[in-house]
Amino acid sequence: MSRYDDFQAFRTRLNQRILGTGDQPGATPGPTSSPGGTLNTRRFFALDGACYKDGALDVKTKEMLGLAASMVLRCDDCIAYHIDQCLKVGVSEQELWEVFDVALIVGGSIVIPHLRRAVDFMDEAQSRRRAP
């Protein structure tokens, strides 16, 4: 499996476990589901999803902000997630490079290792989108 596939599978599996939705992403927990996280955990996940919807800022801008913040905070899973979301909403490679630049300026040289992994993930995600 590739890093991209590993990330997607891990995220899906653990989100289902945390949210108690079994095999159905987004489903309401039922009697056969594992209990998962608390109501507060589920509320936080819902708030996170709602925060990235269109508002005064569009989804594309919010995802780029999320990516820059994730790089500065040095969260590799968050970086991968936001790169994937950025590509899904039409952020160009050039725009991603500018987001990376902002993160480098704000976060400093400690961001460089995360930049390397971000570029690697971006390249793989883009190649998957181009593949038939």
Predicted regions and their residues:
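Alpha-helical scaffold segments that form or flank carboxylate-/histidine-based iron centers
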Residues: 62-70, 99-103
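Residues in soluble alpha-helical coiled-coils and helical-bundle/repeat scaffolds
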Residues: 52, 73-74, 91
